[in-house]
A protein has these predicted regions:
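N-terminal signal peptide c-region/cleavage motif recognized by signal peptidases
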Residues: 12-14
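Beta-strand elements of repeat-based all-beta scaffolds
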Residues: 3, 17-298
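Sec-dependent signal peptide recognition
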Residues: 2-9
Length: 298
């Protein structure tokens, strides 16, 4: 019976729950030093997160934290595959001690569908995923009628996933270490494309296949071709090798060069990489101490 006494002392705390039907975590951040937690409402910030049966957050409430001391509620939902395709904006509601709102989705929509928010009917960020087990995002829309997915004048972020092509011409910069471990930058030409499976095993560390990630920003339109896009090339380890942006469809490259240990040793901004490529005919290697961004290799 002695071991039960401490447990019985804490049982009364269980009746203070914000909800008798939902799992939740109630956290308090104090704005003043306290040893007992006995402070006023203005001296603390209380946040409550409710969870479903799978342990996923379904509602977040910042208790009494609006300018007029109302609760700030954020609705969270998932699709049939468990993905969070829509991230809703929070809305303010009468302070109810952080209790769970069963009509949070309806209240969110009605809160923003007013003149104050230009009668917004999509108060959420929306992400569309490709139909594959990888669940890679292919399109992202922002809140607001002008930014929603499917709008005639669409302003969404689009993503494409490809592999290296011959037209990409990605330089294969490497780091060479001398006998005294002095690093030098070496241009090995361009990365090879379309290696056979047997060749990949043998030459994986010399010319690994690169993966190409294309991001088209909210202002992109088909007539832009490459303008308003960014191309990110990564190796089989997931390391960024090249970031390519465009101005009037002219590419501007930033290279990231790693040593044999995987450490990022060089970052070559567009001007530096352009000069190095221009001088690649006579270039063997450049000591790090002699390489100056924007200057000729010496």
């Amino acid at each position: 019976m002695k071991t039960l006494v401490p447990l019985l002392l804490f049982l009364p705390l269980c009746i203070l729950a914000q909800s008798t039907t939902e799992n939740y975590i109630n956290s308090t951040t104090y704005k003043v030093a306290t040893q007992t937690g006995n402070v006023t409402a203005n001296q603390q910030q209380k946040n409550i997160t409710y969870y479903d049966g799978l342990g996923r957050p379904i509602q977040q409430i910042a208790v009494g934290q609006s300018a007029t001391k109302n609760d700030i509620i954020t609705h969270i939902e998932y699709d049939h595959l468990g993905r969070q395709t829509k991230s809703y904006l929070p809305y303010a509601s009468k302070n109810n001690g952080g209790s769970y709102r069963t009509n949070a989705l309806l209240k969110t929509n009605s809160f923003y569908n007013t003149n104050a928010f230009q009668n917004t009917t999509n108060p959420y960020n929306e992400t569309l995923f490709e139909e594959s087990p990888l669940n890679l995002p292919i399109e992202m829309a922002a809140p607001g009628n002008d930014w929603k997915e499917g709008n005639v004048n669409e302003h969404t972020i689009k993503k494409e996933y490809k592999v290296l092509e011959n037209a990409d011409q990605v330089c294969n910069f490497r780091v060479s270490l001398s006998s005294d471990n002095t690093p030098s930058l070496v241009n090995k030409g361009v990365f090879e494309v379309g290696l056979q499976e047997s060749q990949r095993v043998q030459t994986a560390f010399k010319a690994p296949t690169l993966y190409k990630f294309i991001t088209k920003d909210e202002n992109w339109k088909p007539s832009d071709v490459n303008d308003n896009t960014t191309q990110n090339y990564k190796d089989f380890r997931g390391r960024t090798i090249l970031k390519r942006s465009f101005d009037n469809n002219i590419p501007h490259d930033t290279y990231y060069v790693y040593d044999d240990y995987g450490n990022l040793s060089y970052v070559l901004p567009p001007l530096a990489s352009e000069k190095m490529i221009a001088y690649k005919t006579g270039m063997q290697s450049y000591p790090a101490s002699k390489f100056v961004t924007g200057g000729n290799p010496t």
